Amino acid sequence: MMRIASQLTFCSPDEIMRRAVVELDEQKIITRLFSLDGNAVESAQTLFYDGILSAEIISVKEQVSMLDNLASEYNYIDLSLGIPTEIVASEKPLLLDFGTHSPEKINQIFAGLTQVISAFSIFEIIAACCYYPALVVGEGASLSANRKTKILLWEGSDLVNKRITKQTRIRGIS
């Protein structure tokens, strides 16, 4: 069993937990998700990280054949084709598709993406990379008990202003 905690845990756009522990079994299935607030002591054998925890980034392009249909429901941006000069916020949820699951490749794209997505909060960006793609491919989107997923750490972001920075990086921790 593995326990991971950080300042913030992105479960869904409507649920962002502070000081939460994600408990995973050997198969990477979440067994529990709980807050440390109100506990007299810290959870034993918990790895603490500086940043935001989320589910894994999903590439819709790798799993969905009818990408044209996405435009009616999402502000779909295919970053595997290059970084756009501008991403305009719309009524539709933003969906960022890196065309890969590799944190190294995603971090390379992030380096050039910072200015283009500066109008969006870090939580909108995490939802665009993790939550909405999971909905599209039919997986459980919320970070919750019984979900099998890799856990990512979003580090180097501005947690006070809830923005990404040029130092923002992701890495797999489970």
Spans of model-derived segments:
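Histidine-rich, glycine-flanked metal-binding segment
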Residues: M2, S12-D78, T85-I87, P93, ...
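A cross-domain feature marking catalytic cores of carbohydrate-active enzymes
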Residues: L79-I83, F98-T100
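Residue-level signal for inorganic ion chemistry
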Residues: Q7
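Well-ordered, non-membrane alpha-helical segments in soluble/globular domains
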Residues: G82-V88, E104-I109
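His/Asp/Glu-enriched, well-ordered alpha-helical/loop segment
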Residues: P93-S174
